[in-house]
C-alpha cells in the first residue's frame, strides 16, 4: 500500500523545453532503476513550471529514491532552473490504483 510521496516543483528558464524534456526522461530512467518507487509522474504546470510526483510504500523507500533521484539530478542540471527546485514530503491519505 502506498503511504508517502514526494512532490517536486521546478521553475525552469524559458526556451529550454528540449533540455527540460531530456531532464525528465533521464529522471524516469533513474526511477525505473529504483524498485521502491512504484508510481512516478513528471508534468508541466505552465511554460516555465514543471513538477514530478512519486509515491512509496514506506518512508525508507522514499528516502532511498531521494538520495539518488531528483535532488541529486537537479543539482547536476542547475543551469536549467531559475532557482533550486522544491521537494515536499507528503503523506498519502487515500490511493486509488487500477
Model-inferred region functions:
Residues 1-5, 9, 38-51, 74-98:
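Glycine-rich beta-strand-turn "strand-cap" elements at beta-sheet edges
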Amino acid at each position: 500500500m502506498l503511504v508517502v510521496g514526494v512532490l517536486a516543483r521546478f521553475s525552469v528558464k524559458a526556451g529550454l523545453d528540449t533540455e527540460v524534456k531530456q531532464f525528465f526522461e533521464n529522471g524516469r530512467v533513474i526511477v525505473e532503476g529504483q524498485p521502491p518507487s512504484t508510481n512516478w509522474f513528471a508534468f508541466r504546470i505552465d511554460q516555465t513550471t514543471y513538477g514530478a510526483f512519486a509515491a512509496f510504500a514506506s518512508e525508507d523507500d522514499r528516502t532511498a529514491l531521494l538520495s539518488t533521484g531528483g535532488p541529486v539530478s537537479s543539482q547536476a542540471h542547475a543551469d536549467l532552473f531559475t532557482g533550486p527546485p522544491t521537494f515536499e514530503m507528503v503523506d498519502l491519505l487515500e490511493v486509488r490504483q487500477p
